[in-house]
């Protein structure tokens, strides 16, 4: 058949598809990427967009590995660490579903739980630290020190290992994940913004003027991930809402995106409202309320006595089905500081841990915060997640797509 234009063949790239916490994403070793995608830039972004199947005007990511939600449109690049006393560098890319954008501005706390396991399985952690006990089956905990390259922070993952191999199966249950697995403890060290104040405005609570919405009380914090917290009742909600109530309401989504954009300007993350469209990953916007009974998305009944506070958070323009791991760090940190909206909704006072209700159930997370010379700081935040490999092999994409 003469006259046909020859098309570039597909290329094969080694990759691993992993769940971490309530998210899942495609993991790459930096050295396995095509050479032109081993450095930041358009080639890398275009490769990851094609892998995930974005931008997709249908919003389904049918022609890629993405799952058409913010929790499943994620990519991770791991490499031997460039930092002293760290095992790996971890770079996270949040891929937009309907726009040609990979957002590198923040971390994914859920996938962090999978980074430690991936680092061990990929040979980035010395074998001496993952001993094989031979015929004796012994599960040990291996500490993996991770440099989070997006936000320049240290994260410690404590990964269970049995006879030299990552232990993925177990009985740890995590609301938002159907099946139990092995527990991975994750510690976020000094999770507040290292380049500025934890509270960028200098206040625990601000008046945030949002055109078309009004003036809202807001706690704007940069810990784990920049987050704008507002009171649920200020925008007509009670904090027990599930996804359909928010995600099925275009007006509500537009309102929350407007709040997020004006919060981003107030926090100094962007200079103009227009920039928010290409910075979808950060900041997050969340609304809080005192505890109340509700039915989680699984049908499980959550009772007031089981939780300290209700939190609902939006990610990439949609209400999250559970809670982003980094937002959980922000929640724990804000809850530990008397006077923030999160702390007040949880009953006020000093606390080192908080159990919050989210659409899929509950989560407990701890934080150690203290005030030094009038500035609040947090030394670490701790949570438990789980992770496992879903698939490993090769990703195939057209060779001319990047």
Residue ranges and their predicted role:
Residues 2-402:
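A glycine-rich beta-to-alpha transition motif near the start of alpha/beta enzyme domains, typified by
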């Amino acid at each position: 058949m003469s006259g046909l234009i020859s098309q570039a063949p597909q290329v094969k790239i080694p990759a691993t598809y992993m769940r971490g916490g309530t998210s899942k994403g495609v993991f790459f070793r930096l050295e396995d990427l095509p050479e032109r995608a081993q450095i930041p830039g358009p080639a890398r972004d275009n490769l990851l967009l094609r892998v995930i199947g974005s931008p997709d005007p249908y919003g389904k990511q049918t022609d890629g590995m993405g799952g058409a939600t913010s929790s499943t449109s994620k990519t991770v690049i791991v490499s031997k660490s460039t930092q002293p006393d760290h095992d790996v560098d971890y770079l996270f890319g949040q891929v937009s579903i309907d726009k040609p954008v990979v957002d590198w501005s923040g971390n994914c706390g859920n996938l962090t739980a999978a980074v430690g396991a991936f680092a061990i399985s990929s040979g980035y952690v010395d074998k001496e630290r993952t001993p094989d006990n031979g015929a004796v089956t012994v599960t040990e905990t291996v500490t993996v020190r991770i440099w989070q390259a997006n936000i320049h922070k240290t994260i410690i993952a404590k990964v269970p290992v049995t006879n030299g191999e990552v232990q993925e199966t177990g009985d740890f249950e995590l609301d938002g994940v159907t099946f139990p697995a092995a527990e991975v403890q994750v510690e976020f060290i000094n999770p507040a913004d290292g380049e500025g104040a934890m509270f960028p405005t200098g206040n625990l609570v601000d008046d945030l003027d949002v055109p078309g919405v009004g003036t809202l009380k807001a706690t704007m914090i940069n810990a784990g991930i920049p987050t704008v917290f507002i009171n649920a009742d200020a925008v007509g909600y009670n904090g027990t809402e599930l996804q359909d109530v928010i995600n099925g309401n275009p007006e509500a989504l537009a309102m929350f995106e407007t709040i997020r954009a004006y919060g981003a300007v107030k926090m100094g993350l962007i200079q103009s409202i227009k920039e928010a469209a290409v910075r979808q990953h950060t900041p997050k916007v969340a609304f809080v309320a005192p505890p109340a009974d509700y039915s989680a998305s699984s049908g499980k009944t959550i009772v007031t006595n089981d939780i300290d506070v209700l939190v609902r958070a939006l990610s990439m323009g949609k209400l999250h089905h559970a809670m982003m791991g980094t937002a959980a760090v922000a929640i724990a940190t804000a809850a530990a500081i008397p006077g923030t909206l999160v702390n007040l909704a949880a009953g006020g006072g000093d606390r080192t841990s908080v159990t919050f209700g989210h659409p899929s159930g509950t989560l407990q997370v701890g934080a150690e915060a203290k005030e030094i010379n009038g500035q609040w700081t947090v030394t670490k935040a701790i949570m438990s997640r789980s992770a496992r490999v879903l698939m490993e092999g090769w990703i195939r994409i057209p060779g001319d797509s990047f």
